[in-house]
């Protein structure tokens, strides 16, 4: 057995994978797997799959860990019951080379039953990163060892719903939390979605966040048979493998850690069969992200508009996924302190596609420098959980400048008020958005702006007032904590903009989507902005009023409550069509997925976009078709 001290050193990478004996590596992989399945991961999925497990497989391909289903940990009841059906694990491939070997095995098995490679049909689904279970309609079981599992039917009694309101008894699936929901409501409380998912399953009483997630359908049981699929011939899979993987990975709003490929042909599935751990006709492709190791040159504190201090690591210029990386966020100072992120540290970075690079781990910890005072205003910093915060909200220059630039950025109907402009205004005693709206050309020129720039800035201020925007966007621009665009729109679906400052805690809590803790933050936020709001509102902004939910429910047309995406050049301005669609009870999105009901196309739309939409089950209609279904 490994001591806890040794395990901690491996986690911190004081001891690297190549320094472990084979037996130590095997024990650590088992320990990490148990922690993951108990909902308390000790290392990231990427590190487990691509560093530790990959090394173990290379050293000991016949290790028992690769021959049987991983145990699910001690978080579930000791008493196990027989599962209605076997729930095997899935074999994994981490490269095209490994996928090719699986395809070769399919071809050989096909030849034994007279099935040509081109006749083999394949389907692909997202590989969910949740808690596996089996729903027989009466009970829900954990996967356990694949034969016996624990009864966790309590999660349905707590109100957990099934994906797409599909009903019970659909067999194997996973308990997951929507990615968008986690990022909106839970990311500040849980490091990984799996930590939160485990709280839904355990026997202890649910906390407020778990109850809200169930009520909001942010957490769901997803039967595998209800997942969206790609299907096609083996020939097509080989020819378009990367494209298919990219397509399937974004099919659902859940954490996905790969793509599951499986044979459709029944006779071939029967021929290939299974071993003790997995079906031979099925495989999960898990793509390794680009990972580099780089030295940290400096760690600088950055003050956000809310006062949170973000550590920014300056690193040696490094090419990663086609981009040169010189700076990367350290997330918060709690992590800096815990991981030893300091000058001279060696860190592991990853970047997938166009995603912002992030630090996976600190390979070589160094002494850290935790600031005592705000870099901007000099006031002492305080700890709020894992975050260092400057509480000098009214007078901190960085926070003031951040709030002003945020206001104009969120309004999105103006140009010119970026950080350079606002910093110059601040240097001349401009401390609020309301003060900016009192400026004129002469004052701007006296501050040091040229005549042409001054005229343009005043023109942009006038534009921001006259150009129509949604009332919820106007409210969101004030930057209240937890009041982004979505929550502002939700609030204004129940109350008029000028009435919200008199709302009680109870009135906000009664709005669907706002728990008591969020309501408390909203009440405090409204108090903090009311004076500035009144100063700015007097300029009579051209605001589009949000339709109340109760009024939307009186609308009756074919597209009511449907999700649509507009694309291409429209006869009507596309932004106006989006706004009107919302006014008549249509849910407007910007990207195609299986959740979308209709794609409304104008001119100049690529055939590939239309084909992709149709593959996902999205109905395609022209602008004329759309207009005929609603009253414009």
From Swiss-Prot:
In its UniProt record, a GO molecular function of this protein is: metal ion binding
What is known about what this protein does? DNA ligase that catalyzes the formation of phosphodiester linkages between 5'-phosphoryl and 3'-hydroxyl groups in double-stranded DNA using NAD as a coenzyme and as the energy source for the reaction. It is essential for DNA replication and repair of damaged DNA.
Cross-referenced HAMAP family, in alphabetical order?
A: DNA_ligase_A
* Enzyme class at the top of the EC tree: ligase
Q: Which reaction does it catalyse?
A: NAD(+) + (deoxyribonucleotide)n-3'-hydroxyl + 5'-phospho-(deoxyribonucleotide)m = (deoxyribonucleotide)n+m + AMP + beta-nicotinamide D-nucleotide
EC assignment: the record states: 6.5.1.2
Q: Which UniProt keywords apply?
A: DNA damage, DNA repair, DNA replication, Ligase, Magnesium, Manganese, Metal-binding, NAD, Zinc
**Chain sites annotated for binding NAD(+):** 45-49, 89-90, 143, 174, 286
An example Pfam family from this entry, by short name, is: BRCT
Q: Where is the active site?
A: 127
Q: Which protein is depicted?
A: DNA ligase
Please provide the Gene Ontology terms (biological process) for this protein: DNA repair; DNA replication
Residues recorded as binding Zn(2+), renumbered to this chain, are: 374, 377, 390, 396
* Database matches in InterPro entries: BRCT_dom (IPR001357), BRCT_dom_sf (IPR036420), DNA_ligase (IPR001679), DNAligase_N (IPR013840), NA-bd_OB-fold (IPR012340), NAD_DNA_ligase_OB (IPR004150), RuvA_2-like (IPR010994)
Q: Where is the BRCT domain?
A: 561-632
By sequence similarity, the record places it as follows: Belongs to the NAD-dependent DNA ligase family. LigA subfamily.
Q: Which cofactor does it need?
A: Mg(2+); Mn(2+)
